[in-house]
Amino acid sequence: MNQILLCSPILLLLFTVASCDSEQQLDSAMHLKSDSTKSASLKNVAPKNDETQAKIAKDDVALKDAKKGDYIMDIDISDLPLDDYPINRSKSLKSSSIDLNNIPFNKGLDDFPAKEKNQGSNQSALKALQQRLLTEQNNSLLLRNHSIYLMKEIEARKTDIIKVRQLNLDLELELNTVNRRLLELNGQLQNTRKSTKPCKKRSSKDSAPPAANQFQEANVRNTYRNKYLTLLKELSQKINNEIAKVATDVPTETNPSQGNLPTL
């Protein structure tokens, strides 16, 4: 009798587990079927309105009153809206665009101010990043303008360098031309020297005697001496004339004699 009483709860437990497994298999099959027919039924789904919402509410009440085994095989998935009333609530929540599993339902309403604070901090960080972005853009614009100015300066310097190089080339060409002309003149000079004959030296017999040279030197000396004396006489005559003029302008006690300076 005790064995029968112990076996009955075990059998009941096994029956419960088997029913749960069958329900889970049916739920998974229905979910797969709903996913496969979702694309085909999108065109037939009508927009939600008040009538459809009321109908769904009535169906919900009827489904709650009935047993799962009675209605689960009689429902046509294509006749139901996709997201209005899903059969398996947990799986519909997973398939929705909002992942409700990540929402911490176990936390209270005290966490919402923290979220608002986080949003405020995120907004302030976003504003700071925007301000930094504007600053970086301004700095990049300034650097770009400076780089453009430097590039223009570099181009101008390159132009000057090219001009100087061209001028150096012109000067080198002129220098080569002058050197070539000098070489030609040196060649002509060498040819002229070769073409001319050296003069013959005078012999000792043809040279003048020493007495004649001395006489010529004496004549030259006398000539220069006579010129010197003549100039000296003319100078003394001019001096005497000037003295006479001064004597007539300034009266003195004694008349100056010729060749003597007047006394005041």
UniProtKB/Swiss-Prot annotation:
Outcome of mutating residue 79 to N: In strain: Au2, Au3, Au8, La13, La32, La37, NC-004, NC-006, NC-008, Ny4, TW1, TW5 and TW8
GO MF terms held by the record: identical protein binding
Residues the record marks as carrying a glycan: 88, 122, 138, 145
Mutagenesis / variant outcome for changing residue 44 to S: In strain: Au3 and Ma74
Induction comment from the UniProt entry of this chain: Up-regulated in response to mating.
Region Sufficient for promoting ovulation when expressed in females, annotated ranges: 1-138
Keyword Secreted annotated: yes
Disordered: region residues: 189-219
Effect of residue 221 to K: In strain: La3, La10, La15, La27, La31, La37, La60, La120, La125, Ma6, Ma18, Ma20, Ma21, Ma35, Ma37, Ma43, Mo29b, Mo34a, Mo80b, NC-002, NC-010, NFS 5.1, NFS 5.2, NFS 5.4, NFS 6.1, NFS 6.2, NFS 6.4, NFS 7.8, Ny2, SFS 1.2, SFS 1.4, SFS 2.2, SFS 2.3, SFS 3.1, SFS 3.3 and SFS 3.4
Basic residues bias: start-end ranges: 194-203
GO biological process: mating; positive regulation of octopamine signaling pathway; positive regulation of ovulation; sexual reproduction; sperm competition
Subunit structure: Homodimer.
Record's protein name: Accessory gland-specific peptide 26Aa
